[in-house]
Amino acid sequence: MAVRQALGRGLQLGRALLLRFAPKPGPVSGWGKPGPGAAWGRGERPGRVSSPGAQPRPLGLPLPDRYRFFRQSVAGLAARIQRQFVVRARGGAGPCGRAVFLAFGLGLGLIEEKQAESRRAASACQEIQAIFTQKNKQVSDPLDTRRWQGFRLEDYLIGQAIGKGCNAAVYEATMPTLPQHLEKAKHLGLLGKGPDVVSKGADGEQAPGAPAFPFAIKMMWNISAGSSSEAILSKMSQELVPASRMALDGEYGAVTYRRSRDGPKQLAPHPNIIRVFRAFTSSVPLLPGALADYPDMLPPHYYPEGLGHGRTLFLVMKNYPCTLRQYLEEQTPSSRLATMMTLQLLEGVDHLVQQGIAHRDLKSDNILVEWDSDGCPWLVISDFGCCLADERVGLQLPFNSSSVERGGNGSLMAPEVSTAHSGPHAVIDYSKADTWAVGAIAYEIFGLANPFYGQGSAHLESRSYQEAQLPEMPKSVPPETRQLVRSLLQREANKRPSARIAANVLHLSLWGEHLLALKNLKLDKMIAWLLQQSAATLLADRLREKSCVETKLQMLFLANLECEALCQAALLLSSWRAAP
């Protein structure tokens, strides 16, 4: 049927071309020049006069990349045939000329059929994407109903330390529902003493299943920013990149925070990226374990040799059970589960790239983990203190001086970053740097040692390693996943797949086996599969109160659906499977 339609369309185009360019009787105003009533060589109908400033109307959606070059080539061929035909046209159009134009029209008919198919596929993808984009924007905020609360340290009951890093300490915390609970805790001196406080329901009873400390408060160590709120916000502004709009509505001492055009970007919410619910400056308290764990970071009035200032920045986030490193020390996920965990990191990195942000400090310590009702881990990227989120430069950082910071994690620094040399016009491209780090972390997720950590002969350095030195992954790992991890760790960034294409590869390998099994992968078959996946995902999301990890991943896939990126992922998978 498609061939018949293309032939019919080709005949119509061929007939139209013959009628358009065939010689017409009438006055001639010069050798080889048509009269005023003719319109040879202008692509117009005879007798139609166009205004000098008229512009051709665009024909709907732009032609996909894979057809554009061929269409332009055909257009050039048409121009040559037209010129030759006009020269010979005075003697009449012979059978040969008619055959050439008929063949040319048939070729255009086939191209137009492919173009129409691509337009239908692109339109279907856009409609599916619009549905699931709205659903993925619904990131829960436990403080959403407390519009003007939580902007002071005194609003929280702080428990024990969760952990500490290079620039901050993190504590568990809760906010009593009723004001009298807070007043009672303050009266008893429980603030900062690790009280045994649980969340309460609206009636004052403990909410079933509610954690005792649902929040984590990150207290930044302030050594060089001074004690003014302006200086603190300027120095630590990168920490505010994943903050919600409501998080920045509080008063920072005597200062109300305002985002400047030259400041860092504000990251849109994503299920695989941490969300900061509240941010504020306050005096540094003496929290549990401070004198033992980080005495040098305290102000001198707590520790005489302390280097810290008396005021700093506090960030309120969700309290996650553990980090990825802690989870992998206790658990060994199955190959399918590990593939889904790697996929979650790629989804998060793709969102950062689309927002023009580079994390630059991806490691298993900066990835948090929680579980769904089935015990499947859900990963969240955290700690944006080293991120690149500059509106002026995007992901292309000018590297005109060696004093420009490359990022925070030297071991997992992509080759194009670690080997960059400063100069007047030097630029570091971070568009695929975090994707490379995901490839390295994938070794840990699949139960192997990270090849870029440690010492000895097995240790690799991103500056000098060769791809042949990368250790083989276990045979239990699916072949396409092994191939993808190696492709993510290619030294040349332009040879690596983007985070979006890499995520699509894993999506297809997990849930698109039926589609990949087809001998001839056509767009109409792909669209039918996507519609089926959309219906099944919507149904699964409705049937469960809380979506499981697989459903959430499928929703992310459909929310980021792009026809071209999906086709590239399918072709990449097919080429890997066809290779010996």
Curated annotation (Swiss-Prot):
Q: Which CDD domains match?
A: STKc_PINK1
Enumerate the subcellular locations listed in this protein's record, separating them with semicolons: Mitochondrion outer membrane; Mitochondrion inner membrane; Cytoplasm, Cytosol
Stretches that traverse the bilayer = 94-110
- Give the record's GO biological process terms: autophagy of mitochondrion; catecholamine secretion; cellular response to hydrogen sulfide; cellular response to hypoxia; cellular response to oxidative stress; cellular response to toxic substance; dopamine secretion; establishment of localization in cell
EC class of the enzyme, as a word: transferase
Cross-referenced Gene3D superfamilies? Transferase(Phosphotransferase) domain 1 (1.10.510.10)
Q: Which cofactor does it need?
A: Mg(2+)
Binding positions for ATP per the UniProt entry: 162-170, 218
Q: Does the keyword Cytoplasm apply?
A: yes
Q: Which residues does UniProt mark as catalytic?
A: 361
> Which parts of the sequence carry Phosphoserine?
227, 401
The membrane topology of this protein is: Single-pass membrane protein
**Spans annotated as Disordered:** 28-60
Q: Which controlled-vocabulary keywords does the entry list? A: ATP-binding, Autophagy, Cytoplasm, Kinase, Magnesium, Membrane, Metal-binding, Mitochondrion, Mitochondrion inner membrane, Mitochondrion outer membrane, Nucleotide-binding, Phosphoprotein, Serine/threonine-protein kinase, Transferase, Transit peptide, Transmembrane, Transmembrane helix
Which InterPro entries does this UniProt record tie to the protein? Kinase-like_dom_sf, MitoQC_Scaffold_Kinases, PINK1_STKc, Prot_kinase_dom, Ser/Thr_kinase_AS
Its induction, per UniProt?
Induced by oxygen and glucose deprivation in neuronal cells.
Q: Where is this region: Required for outer membrane localization?
A: 111-117
This entry's Enzyme Commission designation comes to 2.7.11.1
Q: Where is the Protein kinase domain?
A: 156-510
Q: Which GO terms describe its molecular function?
A: ATP binding; C3HC4-type RING finger domain binding; kinase activity; kinase binding; magnesium ion binding; protease binding; protein kinase activity; protein kinase B binding
Gene Ontology cellular-component annotations: astrocyte projection; axon; cell body; chromatin; cytoplasm; cytoskeleton; cytosol; endoplasmic reticulum
Its biological purpose: Serine/threonine-protein kinase which acts as a sensor of mitochondrial damage and protects against mitochondrial dysfunction during cellular stress. It phosphorylates mitochondrial proteins to coordinate mitochondrial quality control mechanisms that remove and replace dysfunctional mitochondrial components. Depending on the severity of mitochondrial damage, activity ranges from preventing apoptosis and stimulating mitochondrial biogenesis to eliminating severely damaged mitochondria via PINK1-PRKN-dependent mitophagy.
To which protein family does this belong? Belongs to the protein kinase superfamily. Ser/Thr protein kinase family.
Indicate what this protein is called per its UniProt record: Serine/threonine-protein kinase PINK1, mitochondrial
Species in which this protein is naturally found: Rattus norvegicus
Gene encoding the protein: Pink1
